[in-house]
Amino acid sequence: MNIRFTDHPPLDPVQEGRNVQARGAAILAADAIPMFEPAITVSYQSSGRTLVVGSAEQALPWADRLAGALPVTVLLLDSQQTMPVRPYPVQVARTVAVAGWLGAFEARWQAPGQPVQQGRFDLVLDLSPSRLIPSHQRPHGYYAPGYDEAARDEAVETMLEMVGDFEKPKYFAYKERTCAHGRNGQKGCSACIEICSAQAIQDDGDRIKVNPYLCAGCGACSTACPTGAISYAFPPAALTGKRMQAALRSYREGGGQDPVFVLHDPEHGAALLAQLGDSLPGRVIPLALQHTASTGIDVWFAAVAYGAAGISVLLTGREAPQYAALLDQQMEIAQAVLGGLGYEGPHFQLLRVDAPDELAVALRHAPRGRTPGEPAVFHLANDKRNTLDYALEHLHRHAPVKPEQVALPAGAPFGAIEVDRKACSLCMSCVGACPAGALQDGQGAPLLRFIEKNCVQCGLCASTCPENAITLAPRLSFMETRAQAVVLNESQPFHCIRCNQPFGTLQMVENMLGRLASHPAFSGHLDRLRMCGDCRVIDMMEPRDEMRVTALRRD
């Protein structure tokens, strides 16, 4: 159990009764808004071609059961003196590799003394000692029940029904233009790739590629994404925000105090909460999500702006282990912002429990943080950065303390950059690399401008800079200049010594002269580095005291 305990005033029975009634109204208000809305779907087609992998003892009995209804192929991982006779293909395989999803699995295997073989299958029953597909979230159509007989029986029963056409929602939307994964071959943000428990997101050069067939809909990628380039679409953040806003409005109207949302999944988390009965504190409002990793600081800030005294996120142990670390990091960032604005906390609680008595204890110590004096009326946007702007503007306007800026931990999606002016040559590589439009050139003048509001701290500018002149500075600024283009560096322009046209900066030319002075290509021609590109070519093509044929004397 991972919870943050805080001391709270003794329970007032009268107020607790009001809270319970107000919670009932809040739940009804949230339920009146659909949890989902129509979405784009992803389709699968399965004809039932089934691959069973395992030892003869483990695989053949289950293959026999499946073969009565499905076309089966078996790969045995142990040597056989005599190959078992079956009405379906049985082979011995030393190595087996499987990849894919329902209706589109590709398997490669090699039998002793034989070349590598391959086949396509719709379903896979993996009874091998180590799973062939190791991802935490398994692809649809892939079953690896381990050694538990009940789990194997359940898997086989499910597989018998997996023939036909199937569909699921497309859980994500991706805007390549704002993705901070890479620019010009330089790598920046890989948060979504690293967090995905289904291995559905891959590097694709300067962008990412999301496989909708592997995506399991956890939404952790959208929580980790600093720009909002990848967003959760089932449900979108705007719909979750509507449910929160409606619930809090009804809770306030019912006389409830200090409301806290407990975000849970609709299956295991909901079942755990249902076991609490009257032990559930009146001010705790359960709110089901498709997955508990699908919300982060944008939705949480909005909830606090709407009047929520806290957010508890319930993990039941079935989630990928990296999700807890992600949510903990998000809570650290969010609490740093609220604390810096003078909102006494804590406001956030990460619960990792699998028993109702543990959950009851944890929720009795649910957050009771300070909230704005006036609840916000804005609606969440499906664009993450817009929602953050709305929420932070409201929180700052009503904040007990109004600092110019709040220091944030590393990994926060807000901040500035520091430029070493002595090292920076104003080559503008960083401007071309910035995916968020935070860095801008001088429109012909040798200067570097920066809009802090746009910066997502992806680090592409720092990794691109050839002079290593850029350092990230995570923080959240509330100064008016945050949305303005401020000059980080400027230099006097350098004019071509031949045509007098500006073509760079004095510092850039001096750096080139220092680095290339001893280069044989410029031996005796260093002045060419002081020329613009056109004049440099002209100078190279002009004759230098060469003897012309016409100048030769005839005898």
Language model segments and positions:
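Helix-enriched interaction subdomains in cytosolic or periplasmic regions
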Residues: 1-29, 202, 206-240
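Ferredoxin-type iron-sulfur electron-transfer modules and their immediate structural context
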Residues: 1-71, 75-195, 199, 258-271, ...
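Short hydrophobic alpha-helical runs that function as membrane-insertion/retention elements
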Residues: 51, 73-76, 287-288, 310-315
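Short linker/helix segments within small regulatory modules
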Residues: 205-209, 444-449, 486-490, 510-529
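Cysteine-rich micro-motifs
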Residues: 212-215, 219, 452-458, 522-539
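A contiguous, basic/glycine-rich beta-loop/short-helix subdomain that forms a polymer-engagement track
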Residues: 232-256
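Mobile, glycine- and charge-enriched loop segments
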Residues: 260-293
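Long C-terminal interaction/binding lobes of large macromolecular proteins
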Residues: 282-285, 308-309, 316, 327-357
